[in-house]
Design a protein with these regions (language model features):
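Short helical segment in ABC ATPase nucleotide-binding domains corresponding to the A-loop/adjacent helical element
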Residues: 104, 110-121, 131, 135
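A short, flexible loop at the N-terminus of ABC-type nucleotide-binding domains that lies
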Residues: 2-10, 18-30, 42, 80-81, ...
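Conserved ABC transporter NBD signature motif
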Residues: 67-80, 92
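Helix-to-loop junction immediately C-terminal to a conserved catalytic motif
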Residues: 59
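Conserved small/polar residues in nucleotide/adenosyl-binding loops
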Residues: 148-149
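The feature captures the beta-strand-to-loop junction immediately N-terminal to the Walker
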Residues: 44-46
Length: 151
């Protein structure tokens, strides 16, 4: 990553609000949060405190009701107009991955490379090309190891 990209926060939320009932009850109210690239974050709190909702916003799976939100340098929600920017969300999502609360319900196998291969296999990618895609994908998240046995 170059110096310019390392200065762009992975996520920046300013005065973010979110409600499941059109503003009767605010699940998130006035959240200010900056997550720097490479930083790890743990959300801790009791059931119903908004952890999963906040994670869904940061993952680009939901839009806030208010505030400003930038994901990977893309201004996805504008508090002034209270509107989402679909093309910015789409661009940001290309760099965001999500593991849900019950990963055992979504992961195909306990072997990382097999799980990474699942998507390309189901998209009809030639078996000869999958090994390279696995390497590239794992390198992009700093998990680089050679999986030549899958080629």
């Amino acid at each position: 990553m170059d110096d310019m990209n390392s200065m762009v926060p992975a996520a920046r939320l300013e005065h973010v609000r979110f409600s499941y009932d059109n503003g009767v009850t605010w699940v998130l109210d006035g959240i200010d949060l900056t997550i720097r690239s490479g930083e790890r974050l743990c959300l801790v709190g009791p059931n119903g405190s908004g952890k999963s909702t906040l994670a869904r916003l940061i993952a680009g799976l939901a839009a806030p009701d208010g505030g400003d939100m930038t994901l990977l340098g893309h201004h996805v929600f504008d508090g002034e107009t209270a509107s989402a920017n679909p093309s910015e969300y789409r661009d940001a999502r290309h760099g965001i991955g999500t593991v849900f609360q019950n990963p055992e319900d979504q992961i195909v196998t306990t072997i990382v490379e097999d799980d990474v291969a699942f998507g390309p296999e189901n998209l009809g990618v030639a078996r000869d090309d999958i090994g390279g895609r696995i390497d590239e994908s794992l390198q992009s998240v700093d998990m680089a190891v050679s999986y030549t046995h899958l080629r």
